[in-house]
């Protein structure tokens, strides 16, 4: 509930973009900036034979303040695993 449709880039929902964060498959929340969505190719950076314990996504930190949803559960597992 509350999750908008996928943008087609690795399943990133509208809430990820709106609140400037990404919830990864392991539950970690990563702060994003607008360049992350334009420059990062989720499909290219996920290898099928890579061990999931060693596979890491880039951590991008944005200095702009984030607005959080008021009283609602935001979203879950938008990053492609």
UniProtKB/Swiss-Prot annotation:
Give the Basic residues compositional bias ranges: 66-81
Single GO cellular component annotation?
A: viral tegument
Localization, per the record, is: Virion tegument; Virion membrane; Host cell membrane; Host Golgi apparatus membrane
Q: How does it sit in the membrane?
A: Lipid-anchor
Q: Where is this motif: Di-leucine-like internalization motif?
A: 22-23
Q: Where is this region: Asp/Glu-rich (acidic)?
A: 41-47
Q: Posttranslational modification, per the record?
A: Myristoylation and palmitoylation (probably on one or more of the nearby cysteines at the N-terminus) enable membrane-binding and Golgi apparatus-specific targeting and are essential for efficient packaging.
Q: Which UniProt keywords apply?
A: Host cell membrane, Host Golgi apparatus, Host membrane, Lipoprotein, Membrane, Myristate, Palmitate, Phosphoprotein, Virion, Virion tegument
- Which top-rank group of organisms is this from? Viruses
Q: What is its main location?
A: virion
Segments carrying the region annotation (Disordered) are 47-81
GO biological process per UniProt: anatomical structure morphogenesis; viral budding from Golgi membrane
N-myristoyl glycine-type lipidated residues:
2
Role according to the record: Plays an important role in the cytoplasmic envelopment of tegument proteins and capsids during the assembly and egress processes. Also participates in viral entry at the fusion step probably by regulating the core fusion machinery.
UniProt similarity note: Belongs to the herpesviridae cytoplasmic envelopment protein 3 family.
Assembly:
Interacts with cytoplasmic envelopment protein 2; this interaction is essential for the proper localization of each protein to the assembly complex and thus for the production of infectious virus.
This protein is called: Cytoplasmic envelopment protein 3
Q: What is the scientific name of the source organism?
A: Varicella-zoster virus (strain Dumas)
Q: Please name the taxonomic classification of the source.
A: Viruses, Duplodnaviria, Heunggongvirae, Peploviricota, Herviviricetes
């Amino acid at each position: 509930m509350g999750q908008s449709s996928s943008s087609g880039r690795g399943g990133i929902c509208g809430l990820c973009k709106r609140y400037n964060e990404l919830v990864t498959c392991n539950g970690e929340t990563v702060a994003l900036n607008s360049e992350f969505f334009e420059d990062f190719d989720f499909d290219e950076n996920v290898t099928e034979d890579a061990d999931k314990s060693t596979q890491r996504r880039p951590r991008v930190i944005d200095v702009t303040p984030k607005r959080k949803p008021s009283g609602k559960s935001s979203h879950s597992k938008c990053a492609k695993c």
